[in-house]
Amino acid sequence: MKKYTLLRTFMLFIAALILCGWFSIHTQAAITKGVKAPEQTVCFEPDTTSVLKNPLTGWVMYLGRAWDENFWQTQRYDAMPVNGGDSTVRVSDYAGTCYIRINWNMLESKEGKYVWNDPDSRIYKLLASVRERGMRLAFRINVDSRDQGQNTPLYVKEAGAKGFQDPNNSQIWSPYPDDAVFQQKYEKFLQAFAVAFDDPDKVDFIDAYGLGKWGEAHGVKYNDY
């Protein structure tokens, strides 16, 4: 008898839920039936003057790798003359990305010491000045030292990496890209770089060059090729 009472109570409860659901649906339908949404006209005025800073589009500004954070004033990027010098503009109001071709040695001259972690370093301040103006960064990291300076940190050579001297300057050394020690050290650096800069709010792109003269894949020299 007790089991029958519990079952009957349960069935009544389910029926009540179904009835409440039906009533709710039909009540809502009755309320909204015949109610016409007010007409609304939306007009858009074309913007033909503003520069849209979308990823991978728009103006890209090249950044001198020897510059410091004051270049905005010294190079007049905060007050660039236009219209024959009658007026000035801030370049950062138009360019959305700041691209710098930098080298590994400038970012990690000593193993494990990354300039982006040092607020007192020139590179840290330079990159920070870009971000302060609402621009994203873009990078190429050169490792071949020919025709430039010491682009790969010498700790890589001291660790046993094989390489070659610049024919025009015996004091300048470059690693062979297929050398195992170079690859090990460079991979470690790139992993640390990715942790710091794998952020689309900070970085627009990082190009995949870096080998060869000027990081443009010209005259790449291998050890076993």
Place the predicted regions along the sequence by residue.
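N-terminal substrate-binding region of glycoside hydrolase catalytic domains
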Residues: 31-181
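Bacterial N-terminal signal peptides
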Residues: 11-22
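Generic cytosolic/nucleocytoplasmic N-terminal low-complexity/intrinsically disordered segments
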Residues: 1-2, 32-35, 206
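Short, intrinsically disordered, charge-balanced linker/junction segments flanking boundaries
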Residues: 28-29, 223-225
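Sec-dependent signal peptide cleavage junction
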Residues: 21-31
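Active-site groove signature of glycoside hydrolases
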Residues: 163-224
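Bacterial N-terminal signal peptides that target proteins for export
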Residues: 2-11
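Residue-level detector of bioactive/disordered segments in secreted/extracellular proteins
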Residues: 6, 22-24, 45
